[in-house]
Amino acid sequence: MKYAAHSLLGRSNMRLSDARLLSFDCYGTLIDWEYGITETVTKIATPHGAQPSEQEILSLFASHETKVQDANPTWTYPVILRETWRRMATSLGLPDPATGAEQCERDARTFAESVPNWPAFPDSHDALVELQSRCKVVILSNVDNASFAGSNARLGVTFDAILTAQDIGSYKPDVHNFHVLLAKARAMGVGIEQHVHVAQSLFHDHVPAQSVGLRTAWINRYGAKRAAAGSLGATPAAAPVTPHWEFPTLRALADALLSL
């Protein structure tokens, strides 16, 4: 089913059909990180006799991960995840640095090494391939190179450029990441007027992307689920922002753009 035509003009003078480069967040947009996070935490917690809910897991992750990234922008993502786990473990009543340091470190490594196992959304590969037939496709991701390589093995796409937090030296929502993205797009011959940033997270992507002048397309992957749970999932609350376009899936974005 094609997405509603009124979304194609969005809130700007730029038409979606003007896009020559699409930059993508990966985790939450192309990879179902909430499923991956929840499954991994559940597998770690179960042998300890704990049964945290999905909402509890994601809320704790959202709270702790961003704080660790803010304080340590040059740490690689596995190191970020290990420290995030230590803090989550305390809140979940699992072995932590004070109550069971050795077990906590084993659990932290398991959590940190799980990223390549997180599944891609079912529509990601085909939609990306179709979008790449029309536009350059670029990754702007909050992980390290090795973790993304594992995830990209699931996506099966040869991106035109890949920008990771490890290469940039900071984590979204730092606007520096988006300045680096814009510079890369210019080097590829594409100006901001033909560039759309595509992402699920309002906090990590839409707010900072719009602050540097980018148009944004929201892939609202968790919309109905969020409304039912009254939860923000794995991301913190964002400042008020209105994406220029909104689609429920990447498939819907691809159908819309390729129909023009």
Locate the predicted segments by residue.
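Asp-based, Mg2+/Mn2+-dependent phosphohydrolase catalytic module
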Residues: 2-22, 34, 125, 129, ...
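Short alpha-helical linear motifs
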Residues: 80-85, 131-133, 223
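Alpha-helical structural context
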Residues: 47-48, 91-92, 134, 154, ...
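Residue-level detector of secondary-structure transition/capping positions
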Residues: 45, 65, 132, 185-186
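N-terminal helical cap/lid subdomain that shapes the substrate entry/recognition surface
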Residues: 15-122
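Glycine-rich active-site/cofactor-binding loop and its immediate structural neighborhood
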Residues: 112-114, 127-132
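A general structural signal for well-ordered secondary-structure junctions
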Residues: 67, 134-137
